[in-house]
UniProtKB/Swiss-Prot annotation:
The organism of origin for this protein: Rattus norvegicus (Rat)
Motif COPI vesicle coat-binding location, chain numbering: 211-219
Sites where a glycan is attached: 179
Region of interest (Interaction with ARF1 and IL1B), residue spans: 207-219
Tissue-level expression: Ubiquitous.
Segments in the Lumenal topological domain: 32-185
Gene field: Tmed10
UniProt remark on domains: The GOLD domain is required for proper p24 heterooligomeric complex formation and efficient transport of GPI-anchored proteins.
Source taxonomy: Eukaryota, Metazoa, Chordata, Craniata, Vertebrata
Renumbered residue ranges of the record's region Required for interaction with STX17: 1-142
UniProt keyword list: Cell membrane, Cytoplasmic vesicle, Endoplasmic reticulum, ER-Golgi transport, Glycoprotein, Golgi apparatus, Membrane, Methylation, Protein transport, Signal, Transmembrane, Transmembrane helix, Transport
Subunit structure of this chain's protein: Predominantly dimeric and to a lesser extent monomeric in the ER. Monomer and dimer in ERGIC and cis-Golgi network. Forms homooligomer (via GOLD domain); the assembly is promoted by direct binding with leaderless cargos and may form a protein channel that facilitates cargo entry into the ERGIC. Forms heterooligomeric complexes with other members of the p24 family such as TMED2, TMED7 and TMED9.
Residue ranges, Cytoplasmic side: 207-219
Protein name per Swiss-Prot or TrEMBL: Transmembrane emp24 domain-containing protein 10
Length: 219
């Protein structure tokens, strides 16, 4: 039996696609950290599409040593004020939810305590869509090979990009319709204003004519 010799050959387009995923992967992870003073509230807002899985992990570093009864509350809401996740006295944890509509979502951290307490360090990592999927778990459940997992990621990423372009096209059409409707209203208002000015000018001419006749300035 002859053994394999030389490096493993990869198809050019497939290798390019996998390289694209490798380069895109790290940049698609969104993480943020900030300092939260005592008795203050800070919120982060993000627009997210419909029917997307959103996952996140947070960690709050308490540098007060438990002084002042310091407590930090975490709450995630949509634009209508519906609570999607809430945690009292949050320190470290994870959350997940699925969006029902395209909306603006708000993640708020609120610190409460007494006395002079050092600022807390809040670390938040949020992912949604393709980034939020656990492909390792999918590979275990569906018994996929590493290459098949990367192809699944590529398929999901392509679908996400197509959906984003479709949404942008829809928004463009809506904005164009709004612009055309606004232009039509402006045109009608301009015509109405012109007739009003013509009517006012005509009325002034007749009024002045009667006035001058009454004063016998003209015949």
């Amino acid at each position: 039996m002859s053994g394999l010799s030389g490096p493993l050959s990869w198809p050019g387009p497939l290798l390019s696609a996998l390289l694209f995923l490798f380069l895109l992967g790290p940049s698609s992870v969104l993480g943020i950290s900030f300092h939260l003073p005592v008795n203050s509230r800070k919120c982060l807002r993000e627009e997210i599409h419909k029917d997307l899985l959103v996952t996140g992990a947070y960690e709050i570093t308490d540098q007060s040593g438990g002084a002042g009864g310091l407590r930090t509350h975490l709450k995630i809401t949509d634009s209508a004020g519906h609570i999607l996740y809430a945690k009292e006295d949050a320190t470290k944890g994870k959350f997940a939810f699925t969006t029902e509509d395209y909306d603006m979502f708000e993640v708020c951290f609120e610190s409460k305590g007494t006395g002079r307490i050092p600022d807390q360090l809040v670390i938040l990592d949020m992912k949604h869509g393709v980034e939020a999927k656990n492909y390792e778990e999918i590979a275990k459940v569906e018994k996929l090979k590493p290459l098949e997992v990367e192809l699944r990621r590529l398929e999901d990423l392509s679908e996400s990009i197509v959906n984003d372009f479709a949404y942008m096209k829809k928004r463009e059409e809506e904005m164009r319709d709004t612009n055309e409707s606004t232009n039509t209203r402006v045109l009608y208002f301009s015509i109405f204003s012109m007739f009003c000015l013509i009517g006012l000018a005509t009325w002034q001419v007749f009024y002045l004519r009667r006035f001058f006749k009454a004063k016998k300035l003209i015949e």
